[in-house]
């Protein structure tokens, strides 16, 4: 008798944006007070971003993750106590330790002593977290996973640097994965190249209670753009080959929402019409690890993504890291 294959299937999605919406005009006015010139036209032309959301000072990454997770759990219609694995992808945790995942587990009231840990792969974080949870579920080690991407990038932005502070925003997205005989996550591909660590980083660190070096995000925009458009196409093709699918069989492409030009380039290289790409960067900005699950939840809730659709998610971020997963929703 043939042994059945166990997949991890998406049961539900959820997301949350802090209510403070900051338009390009709002940001330009803030920067003008510091003698820094920018404009809505300048930002939109280079990034496609019109607005982003910033969390209030007393709101943490785990707070954003909590609301997104509650919405995903409700959509999945699962008992929170059945969740035996929590993975949070974030580069802006509440603390150095404990992990944001452990804080989230407690805030959700989950008392089953299931595993909880963070994944740090910056803007590739959600792709890394999905692949990790999928492996745990396929192995039989865990059955029901909560996978979250959550960020408060506004805390590490240098508002004297108009090339970076206009790009990023705060938010959270989540999915519930569960073991199933039905295909769900079909294939994943993950990669990294640490030789590019200096082109997107926060170079400072805390030593003896003092921040040594810069605590703010640093980015070489041209180098990131060049590397991103190259690796995103390759990792997408690799994941599709592992899933035994052709690009034209993809119903929806959900790339990391960093820059509309990078996203459109990847879509063109895969031969997909732009209409099959989910775009939220115009309203969300770059929310790092939260961007993919935020976009996924938007497209699920507005009815674009239906059961049985093939969805390709892909991310690229500091490290340098990149990854993709093919998911049958």
UniProtKB/Swiss-Prot annotation:
UniProt pathway annotation: Lipid metabolism; fatty acid biosynthesis
EC number assigned by the record: 2.3.1.180
Species this chain originates from: Paraburkholderia phymatum (strain DSM 17167 / CIP 108236 / LMG 21445 / STM815)
Family the entry assigns: Belongs to the thiolase-like superfamily. FabH family.
Main location: cytoplasm
Single GO term (MF): beta-ketoacyl-acyl-carrier-protein synthase III activity
One annotated Gene Ontology cellular component of this protein: cytoplasm
Catalysis: reaction(s): malonyl-[ACP] + acetyl-CoA + H(+) = 3-oxobutanoyl-[ACP] + CO2 + CoA
Assembly and oligomerization: Homodimer.
Database matches in InterPro entries: ACP_syn_III_C, ACP_syn_III_N, FabH, Thiolase-like
The organism's place on the tree of life at top rank: Bacteria
Active site: residue positions: 123, 256, 286
The record's note on its domains: The last Arg residue of the ACP-binding site is essential for the weak association between ACP/AcpP and FabH.
Protein's UniProt name: Beta-ketoacyl-[acyl-carrier-protein] synthase III
Alphabetical list of Pfam families matching this protein: ACP_syn_III (PF08545), ACP_syn_III_C (PF08541)
NCBIfam families in UniProt: fabH (TIGR00747), PRK09352.1 (NF006829)
Keyword vocabulary terms for this entry: Acyltransferase, Cytoplasm, Fatty acid biosynthesis, Fatty acid metabolism, Lipid biosynthesis, Lipid metabolism, Multifunctional enzyme, Transferase
Subcellular location(s) per record: Cytoplasm
Single GO BP term: fatty acid biosynthetic process
Top-level EC class as recorded in UniProt: transferase
Family matches, as Gene3D superfamilies: 3.40.47.10
Lineage of source species: Bacteria, Pseudomonadati, Pseudomonadota, Betaproteobacteria, Burkholderiales
Function: Catalyzes the condensation reaction of fatty acid synthesis by the addition to an acyl acceptor of two carbons from malonyl-ACP. Catalyzes the first condensation reaction which initiates fatty acid synthesis and may therefore play a role in governing the total rate of fatty acid production. Possesses both acetoacetyl-ACP synthase and acetyl transacylase activities. Its substrate specificity determines the biosynthesis of branched-chain and/or straight-chain of fatty acids.
Location of the region described as ACP-binding in the Swiss-Prot/TrEMBL record: 257-261
């Amino acid at each position: 008798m043939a042994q059945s294959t166990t997949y991890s299937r998406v049961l539900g999605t959820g997301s949350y944006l802090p209510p403070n919406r900051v338009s390009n005009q709002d940001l330009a006015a803030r920067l003008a007070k510091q003698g820094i010139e920018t404009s809505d036209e300048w930002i939109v032309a280079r990034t496609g971003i019109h607005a982003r959301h910033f969390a209030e000072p007393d709101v943490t990454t785990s707070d954003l993750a909590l609301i997104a997770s509650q919405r995903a759990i409700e959509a999945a219609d699962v008992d929170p106590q059945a969740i035996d694995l929590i993975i949070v992808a974030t580069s802006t945790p509440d603390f150095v330790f404990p992990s944001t995942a452990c804080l989230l587990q407690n805030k959700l009231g989950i008392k089953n002593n299931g595993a909880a840990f963070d994944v740090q792969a910056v803007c590739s974080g959600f792709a890394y977290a999905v692949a990790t949870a999928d492996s745990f579920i396929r192995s039989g080690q865990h059955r029901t996973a909560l996978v979250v991407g959550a960020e408060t990038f506004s805390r590490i932005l240098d508002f004297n640097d108009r090339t970076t502070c206009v790009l990023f925003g705060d938010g959270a997205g989540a999915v519930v994965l569960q073991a199933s005989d039905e295909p769900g996550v079909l294939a994943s591909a993950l990669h990294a190249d640490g030789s590019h660590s200096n082109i997107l980083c926060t170079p400072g660190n805390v030593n003896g209670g003092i921040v040594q070096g810069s605590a703010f995000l640093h980015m070489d925009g041209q180098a990131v753009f060049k590397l991103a458009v190259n690796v995103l196409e390759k990792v997408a093709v690799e994941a599709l080959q592992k899933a035994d699918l052709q690009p034209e069989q993809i119903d929806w492409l959900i790339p990391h929402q960093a820059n509309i030009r990078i996203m459109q380039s990847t879509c063109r290289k895969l031969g997909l019409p732009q209409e099959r790409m989910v775009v939220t960067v115009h309203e969300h900005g770059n929310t790092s690890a939260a961007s993919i699950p935020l976009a996924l939840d938007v497209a699920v809730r507005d009815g674009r993504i239906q059961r049985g659709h093939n969805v390709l998610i892909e991310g690229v971020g500091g490290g340098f890291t990149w990854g993709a997963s093919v998911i049958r929703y």
